[in-house]
Amino acid sequence: TISSAASDVYKRQGGESDIIKSRIIAEEFAKSKIPPPMGGQGIDMLVPTLLELGTEEQKQKYIKPTLHGEIIWCQGYSEPNAGSDLASLQTKGELIDGNWVIHGQKIWTSTAQYSQMMFCLVRTEPDASKHAGISYLLIPMDTPGIEIRPLVDMTLNAGFNEVFFTDVTIPENNI
């Protein structure tokens, strides 16, 4: 839950984590008519990943603003010809002159149209085995070459999106 991820960050900073309070907060949110906060994917998935594997620069730049709701994240995993089979990813990232240049497509991307950032799995080593050579990139959603197409359902809602990458260029340290 959002509160447990935030609680973990607090504990790592020297505070005391309280799982009971975290569960009570999550339960009260669930009972209320308040819509869930946007950015849960960033809080629940990105923040723990950065805590374990991120650089100090990434932790400083992204964790606090994500927990405060200042950065909304979407997840770029599923692809049209791969679904959730991440070993079949076809979106490619090539390191050129200190930048990742990304080409490909993601699908079923929740909240992409509202997000400032995407954490995205991209094949960066094309000659590696199917289950290797995949990197986790942090992509600003306002980068030139990104096109977002909402997938409108029969109730006219667009909770999911297709995201296309054409010559999307991000710094090498966004890995």
Residue ranges and their predicted role:
Residues 69-77:
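A short, Trp-centered hydrophobic/proline-enriched beta-strand micro-motif
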Residues 84-85, 100:
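Hydrophobic, small-residue-rich alpha-helical packing segments that form membrane-like cores
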